[in-house]
């Protein structure tokens, strides 16, 4: 049953309640007469009880339907259970999205920290490499200086034996 049918069913129940009340009123009128007919009073009373029983069963049916709807139990012609499942699915999706967003933020924080640490390590490695290059250059300069000094000593030592003259001439040749 669709919602429109449910509304029509409730309208019918309302009409039966009105008939039930009219039957009760007619039965009371019959009993209130000075010359009341017991047969008419019984007929009206039976009609009242019959319509009351019908109203009670139809109202119970509607109450059962509303109980099913309100507790989310599946029932004929209702989209409530499907709507509830859909709503819960949307809720789960929203929760999953927020959790993914949190994880992405955490990842971004950690990857940023990792990039900074990697940058510091690279800078440190570059500084060490530069320092090693400077040390190598200093060692090369020292080796070159030592080689130059050794060469000067070797060339300077050979000149010292030939005389004190800066030109390297022989002192015995200078006397006449």
Curated annotation (Swiss-Prot):
Location (main, coarse): nucleus
Molecular-function GO term, any one: transcription coactivator activity
GO cellular component term, pick one: nucleus
Domain of life, source organism: Eukaryota
InterPro entries for this protein: Mediator_Med11
Compositionally biased tracts (Basic and acidic residues): 99-108
Family stated for the protein in its record: Belongs to the Mediator complex subunit 11 family.
Oligomer status and interactors: Component of the Mediator complex, which may include CDK8, MED4, MED6, MED11, MED14, MED17, MED18, MED20, MED21, MED22, MED27, MED28, MED30 and MED31.
Official protein name in the record: Mediator of RNA polymerase II transcription subunit 11
Organism in which the protein naturally occurs: Drosophila melanogaster
Organism ancestry: Eukaryota, Metazoa, Ecdysozoa, Arthropoda, Hexapoda
């Amino acid at each position: 049953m669709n919602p429109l049918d449910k509304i029509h069913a409730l309208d019918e129940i309302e009409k039966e309640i009105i008939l039930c009340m009219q039957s009760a009123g007619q039965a009371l009128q019959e009993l209130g007469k000075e010359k009341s007919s017991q047969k008419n009073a019984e007929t009206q009373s039976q009609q009242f009880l019959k319509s009351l029983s019908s109203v009670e069963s139809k109202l119970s049916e509607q109450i059962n339907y509303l109980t099913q709807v309100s507790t989310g139990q599946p029932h004929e012609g209702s989209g409530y259970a499907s709507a509830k499942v859909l709503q819960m699915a949307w809720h789960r999706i929203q929760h999953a999205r927020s959790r993914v967003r949190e994880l992405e933020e955490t990842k971004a924080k950690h990857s940023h920290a990792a990039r900074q640490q990697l940058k510091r390590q690279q800078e440190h490695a570059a500084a060490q490499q530069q320092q090693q290059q400077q040390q190598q250059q200093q060692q090369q300069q020292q080796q070159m200086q030592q080689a130059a000094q050794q060469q000067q000593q070797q060339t300077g030592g050979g000149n010292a034996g030939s005389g004190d003259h800066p030109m390297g001439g022989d002192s015995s040749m200078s006397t006449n």
